[in-house]
Amino acid sequence: TQVTAVAQHQGEPDRAPSAEELRNATLEVPERCGLRVSPSEASEQGRERVTFVDGQASGGSQQNARTTMKEVVTTVFEGRPAAVVRANCFYGGAYGDDFIMVYDPDRKLVAALDPVPHKQELGGSISDFTITSLSVFGGSLHLSWNNIALYGDENYHASRKSGSADGDFVWDGQRFVATDIVFHTGQGDVRLPRLEAVQDFVDAVVAHDDAKAAQWAVPSLMSALDRHAPYSGFTVRESHFPKGSTVGECILLPAVSLPDDLGMSTVYFSNGRQAWIRAGDASQIVQEGPYRSGDIMCGLDRSADHSDRFGTWIMLRGRPDGGVEVYTPGPGSD
């Protein structure tokens, strides 16, 4: 505006836009919050302009869609004052997500956190990403969120979700990247393990280096490795840890679909791949009890020719330090 231009020309320091200024302004927002396209058609880097009145924007081509400001916090972002906005973007149907938007003194959108492409990283089965707490430290965010559907929860939109999380995010110039996430589950606090650490366990099992592998597994699994696997003429080691096995992805075990006619449910990974699990049953290979909220599933690949489904996987007990504690393989364990 002219007033802003004159103030800056006279040497007044930059200041972050106030909540009142933002709540009644035309602003750039992430495309998924722009009221024009469905969330599935929008891109993470896409942008739209909307007009807020008393903190809410509506009236786009997406019927009943609206974007509502929930909170405004000031900070210094990349050397300049900035306002960090927590907003809920409701897509016009049953779903909506909380977004983070950062505006500089000129009310230009300079950064945003779009949770939609990263929901698996943020907790797996999340219908609506709901931020319950926001803290800002320069270009870093600390968020708390809930509404995470964990194993044992019912798997439909309106069901009660038992999981929540806290996470730190750092701006890398393109997006806010999660640097540490702690999930709060029925099993206690859980961090996902590093894939390299899980791979070390798999490599040790394949190499018959059981003394090394034992540091990452329960004793009952180690003693079962050279027993015959169910429905197989091979051992557990041969069936579930063949040479060349690589860890594809590890996820917090989510709420699962209803069982099919064979009693199997599908688990979805963030990379679009799937695995089968017999929900609710105790392991048949290692008697460590049934799967639990807070468990971690790691999908294994047998070769470079990946299909859309992990043929084998291993289940870990979640640990607060992200340590590896494997207790059973699958799907033969079902």
Residue ranges and their predicted role:
Residues 11-42, 124, 129-334:
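Acidic, small-residue rich beta-repeat scaffolds with periodic aromatic anchors
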Residues 1-73:
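Terminal domain-start segments
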Residues 76-88, 137-146:
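Acidic/hydrophobic-patterned starts of short beta strands in beta-sheet-rich repeat architectures
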Residues 110-120, 178-183:
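Beta-propeller fold detector
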Residues 73, 86-89, 101-102:
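Predominantly extracellular/secreted and cell-surface proteins with exposed
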Residues 90-94:
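Extended, low-complexity, turn-rich repeat/linker tracts enriched in Gly/Pro/Ser/Thr and Asp/Glu
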Residues 61-69, 119-128:
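Repeat-based blade/solenoid architectures
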Residues 95-114, 169-173:
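Beta-propeller blade repeat segments, especially FG-GAP/WD-type strand-to-loop junctions
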